[in-house]
C-alpha cells in the first residue's frame, strides 16, 4: 500500500517518551501510532519495530533511537523513543533528537523511580520546555487513593525541578490495554474502547499543553562562519549554513567571537553561485560583507543580528563522557584537564576548572561513561548561549558531548 504523503499545513512539533525502564514508553508509543492509524493519520508501528531502534551517530556518538511520526487533527508530530537509559542521556545531551515537549511515562504500580527523576532533571537541564504525564498500567491498580498519592508525588517532583507541577496534565491509562484493543480491531475509533479513549485524551493534552515552538526562521539571524575568501573588487565573503532567522541585503550584522565584536553590512547574498535577496534558516549561503578584510573574519566566528548573541569565555555544561567502547578515553581525567571544545564550526581550547557528579555531589575524577556538570574556561571568547550543544575533543576525536546549562561570564 502506498504511503500517504504528510501534508505540511499543520504546525510541526517534536516530542518524545521519557521515563523509567519498563514503565511502558515503547508500548505507549506503539499504542499512539496504532490509535491514530485508525484515523489514517499515522503508519501503525508494532512494539518490536520501535524497540529495534536503529543506531545513528550524533556528534560522533552512537545512539539508538526510534523515530515515528503521526498527526492529530491539530498538528504533525515527530516522536522519539529510546530503548536504553544510556541512549536517553546521550540523545538529550547531544540534541540528536531535539524535543519541544515530552511525555513522561510513569507506571502507577511503581510511582516515580530513579530514572523518572533523572529524566525530569535531564529535561530541565537540556531545555525541554514542557512535560505531559501518562500514568500507565492503571489497569493493574484499582485503588483510587493510591493513584491520587502517586499523582501528588509526581506533581511535587516536577515542581522540585522547576516544571509547573500543579498544572501539568496527568492522564491515566494503559498503553498495553490500548495496544491490545487496537491489535484486536485496528479500526477502533474514539468512543469504542475506554483504553483507546485514554490515548486520545493524552494526545488532546499534548496538543493543548505543549506549545508550538517558534520556527527557526522566526528567530534572530545567526550563521556560523565556515569559510572566508575575498573576491577582487567586491570584498570579503563568509560562507556557512544559516542556523536561524533570515538575512536580507543591506542588513546590519555583528561578527561575534574570538576577537572584539564588529558590525558590518551585508551587501550581497549568494547561494549555489546565484544571487539572492534573502537567505533563511537552513540555507548554505555566502554573505558579502562591507568593509571587512579577509583576515578580519575566521572560521568559528558567527554573523548574527546585532545584540542577539554575545561572546563568552566561561560557562557551566552538562556533559556525557564517552566510554572507551564508544571511542572515548580509556583513562579518567581530573580538574585542570585542557581539551578542545568544538562549538558550531570550530575547536577552542578550554580548561575544565571544576566538576561535580550530576546530582551535585563532589567527584574526584571523571571516568569514561560518566555524566557530569563542569565549569569550563575557554582561551578565546566565542558566541555562546544557554542550551547550545558542544563536543569535547582530544586529538581530533570526540571524547564527550555537552550542553551549556549556564553562562558564567
Swiss-Prot record:
Keyword presence, Nucleotide-binding: yes
Reaction catalyzed: GTP + H2O = GDP + phosphate + H(+)
InterPro entries: EF-Tu_GTP-bd, EF-Tu_GTPase, EFTu-like_2, EFTU_2, G_TR_CS, P-loop_NTPase, Small_GTP-bd, T_Tr_GTP-bd_dom
Gene Ontology cellular-component terms listed: cytosol
Region (G3): 81-84
GO molecular function: GTP binding; GTPase activity; translation elongation factor activity
Principal location listed in the UniProt entry: cytoplasm
Classification via PROSITE patterns: G_TR_1, G_TR_2
Residues at which GTP binds: 19-26, 81-85, 136-139
Keywords: Cytoplasm, Elongation factor, GTP-binding, Hydrolase, Magnesium, Metal-binding, Nucleotide-binding, Protein biosynthesis
Disulfide bonds: none
G4 as annotated region, ranges: 136-139
Classification via Gene3D superfamilies: P-loop containing nucleotide triphosphate hydrolases (3.40.50.300), Translation factors (2.40.30.10)
Region (G5): 174-176
One Pfam family hit: GTP_EFTU_D2
Domain of life: Bacteria
Residues covered by region (G2): 60-64
EC number: 3.6.5.3
Residues binding Mg(2+), per UniProt: 26
Keyword Cell membrane: no
Domain tr-type G residue range list: 10-214
Function according to Swiss-Prot or TrEMBL: GTP hydrolase that promotes the GTP-dependent binding of aminoacyl-tRNA to the A-site of ribosomes during protein biosynthesis.
NCBIfam families membership: EF-Tu, PRK00049.1, PRK12735.1, PRK12736.1, small_GTP
Quaternary data: Monomer.
Family, similarity comment: Belongs to the TRAFAC class translation factor GTPase superfamily. Classic translation factor GTPase family. EF-Tu/EF-1A subfamily.
UniProt-recorded name of the protein: Elongation factor Tu
Amino acid at each position: 500500500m502506498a504511503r500517504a504523503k504528510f501534508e505540511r499545513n499543520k504546525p510541526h512539533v517534536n516530542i518524545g517518551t521519557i521515563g523509567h525502564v519498563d514503565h511502558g514508553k515503547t508500548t505507549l508509543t506503539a499504542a499512539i501510532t496504532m490509535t491514530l492509524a485508525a484515523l489514517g493519520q499515522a503508519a501503525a508501528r508494532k512494539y518490536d519495530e520501535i524497540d529495534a531502534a536503529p543506531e545513528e551517530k550524533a556528534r560522533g556518538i552512537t545512539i539508538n533511537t526510534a523515530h515515528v511520526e503521526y498527526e492529530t487533527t491539530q498538528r504533525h508530530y515527530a516522536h522519539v523513543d529510546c530503548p536504553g537509559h544510556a541512549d536517553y542521556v546521550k540523545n538529550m545531551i547531544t540534541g540528536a533528537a531535539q524535543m519541544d515537549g515530552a511525555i513522561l511515562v510513569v507506571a502507577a504500580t511503581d510511582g516515580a523511580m530513579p530514572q523518572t527523576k533523572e529524566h525530569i532533571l535531564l529535561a530541565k537541564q537540556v531545555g525541554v520546555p514542557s512535560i505531559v504525564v501518562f500514568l500507565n498500567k492503571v489497569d493493574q491498580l484499582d485503588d483510587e487513593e493510591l493513584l491520587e498519592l502517586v499523582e501528588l508525588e509526581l506533581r511535587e517532583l516536577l515542581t522540585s525541578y522547576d516544571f509547573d507541577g500543579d498544572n501539568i496534565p496527568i492522564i491515566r491509562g494503559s498503553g498495553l490495554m490500548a495496544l491490545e484493543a487496537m491489535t484486536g480491531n485496528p479500526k477502533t475509533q474514539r468512543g469504542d474502547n475506554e483504553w483507546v479513549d485514554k490515548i486520545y485524551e493524552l494526545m488532546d493534552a499534548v496538543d493543548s499543553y505543549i506549545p508550538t515552538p517558534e520556527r527557526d526562521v522566526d528567530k534572530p539571524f545567526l550563521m556560523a562562519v565556515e569559510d572566508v575568501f575575498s573576491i577582487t573588487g567586491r570584498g570579503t565573503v563568509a560562507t556557512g549554513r544559516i542556523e536561524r532567522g533570515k538575512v536580507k541585503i543591506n542588513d546590519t550584522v555583528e561578527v561575534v567571537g574570538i576577537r572584539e565584536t564588529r558590525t558590518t553590512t551585508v551587501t550581497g547574498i549568494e547561494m549555489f553561485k546565484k544571487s539572492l535577496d534573502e537567505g533563511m534558516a537552513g540555507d548554505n549561503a555566502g554573505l558579502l560583507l562591507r568593509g571587512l578584510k579577509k583576515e578580519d573574519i575566521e572560521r568559528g566566528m558567527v554573523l548574527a543580528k546585532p545584540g542577539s548573541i554575545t561572546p563568552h569565555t566561561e560557562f557551566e555544561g552538562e556533559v556525557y563522557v564517552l566510554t572507551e567502547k564508544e571511542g572515548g578515553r580509556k583513562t579518567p581525567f581530573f580538574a585542570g584537564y585542557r581539551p578542545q571544545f568544538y562549538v558550531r564550526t570550530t575547536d577552542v581550547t578550554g580548561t575544565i576548572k571544576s566538576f561535580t557528579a550530576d546530582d551535585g555531589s563532589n567527584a574526584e575524577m571523571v571516568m569514561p561513561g560518566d555524566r557530569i556538570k563542569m565549569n569550563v574556561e575557554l582561551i578565546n571568547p566565542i558566541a555562546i548561549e544557554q542550551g547550545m550543544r558542544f563536543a569535547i575533543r582530544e586529538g581530533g576525536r570526540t571524547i564527550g558531548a555537552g550542553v551549556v546549562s549556564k553562562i558564567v561570564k
